[in-house]
């Protein structure tokens, strides 16, 4: 059995592309990151990149793949495109969320280089410090609803994306009496913990009365020492 195979070249009538990609943002762990901020030894580099046509995600072309350089070439990471997620709205571009590991203490730089399919390239550099025992940061603590009548799911917004963290939530009455607590350890879902659910009962299994309660959330990054972060909020419980 025979088949015809057609091989096509480039379109000579196509408009040349001389516009490089745009790195719209680059930071470590959270968008609140500031230059030379101190981070944990296993931070995540996050960048938003766009192009007027298309970002090159191929790893076949030597020197034209997405690359991250640590300390201006002291070490390079060439599997960056595996951690690229396209924009949901169909724009030519997306988000890079690249997990790093084992960076030594002290000052460092990370330089990101991306290409489009022309190929044109763009670069951006982020400067930072690394230290052990860096406490995580809690940006928000909240429940899926407030007030609640049947159960409450607690969430914590933080700066430890894709890290193994221990989360504890404690509930108190307004006199400070502890009523309930729960602790879980697991992989964080980027910037938000998985929910811890309270069924509105105390440690003895009795449903709490309607009223206002205090809850305190604590997180600990298991890869970054014993430092913790804590935040508290109020929760209203109504009748069923």
Whereabouts are the PLM-identified features?
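Short, glycine-anchored, charge-dense loop/turn motifs used at functional sites
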Residues: 171-179, 213-215
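Surface-exposed loop/turn motifs at beta-strand-loop junctions within extracellular Ig-like
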Residues: 51, 114-118, 173, 202, ...
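Short, surface-exposed loop/turn motifs with a glycine/proline- and acidic-biased composition
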Residues: 100, 104-105, 185-224
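Glycine-centered coil/turn sites that cap beta-strands in beta-rich domains
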Residues: 134-173, 195, 223-225
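Short, compositionally biased P/S/T/A/G/V-rich stretches that sit at domain boundaries
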Residues: 8-43, 50, 131-147
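C-terminal tail/sorting-segment detector
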Residues: 124-127, 131-142, 151, 206, ...
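Long, low-complexity serine/threonine/glycine- and acidic-rich segments characteristic of extracellular
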Residues: 27-32, 46-132, 178, 186-191
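Short, conserved beta-strand segments of beta-strand-rich sandwich/propeller modules, principally
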Residues: 44, 107-111, 153, 166, ...
């Amino acid at each position: 059995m025979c088949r015809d195979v057609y091989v096509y070249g480039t379109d000579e009538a196509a408009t040349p592309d001389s516009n490089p990609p745009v790195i719209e943002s680059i930071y470590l762990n959270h968008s609140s990151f500031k230059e030379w901020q101190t981070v944990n030894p296993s931070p995540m580099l996050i960048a938003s990149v766009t192009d007027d046509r298309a970002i090159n995600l191929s790893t076949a072309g030597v020197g034209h793949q997405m690359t991250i350089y640590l300390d201006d070439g002291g070490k390079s990471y060439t599997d960056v495109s595996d951690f690229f997620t396209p924009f949901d709205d169909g724009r030519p571009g997306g988000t890079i969320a690249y997990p790093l590991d084992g960076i030594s203490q002290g000052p460092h730089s990370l330089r990101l280089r991306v290409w489009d399919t022309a190929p044109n390239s763009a670069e951006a550099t982020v400067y930072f410090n690394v230290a052990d025992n860096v406490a995580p940061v809690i940006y928000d603590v909240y429940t899926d609803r407030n007030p609640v009548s049947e159960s409450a799911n607690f969430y914590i917004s933080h700066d430890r994306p894709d890290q193994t963290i221990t989360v504890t939530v404690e509930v108190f009455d307004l006199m400070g009496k502890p009523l309930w607590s729960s602790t879980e350890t697991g992989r964080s879902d980027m910037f938000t913990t998985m929910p811890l659910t309270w069924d509105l009962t105390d440690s003895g299994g009795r449903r709490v009365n309607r009223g206002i309660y205090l809850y305190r959330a604590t997180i600990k990054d298991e890869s970054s020492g014993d430092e913790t972060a804590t935040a508290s909020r109020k929760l209203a419980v109504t009748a069923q």
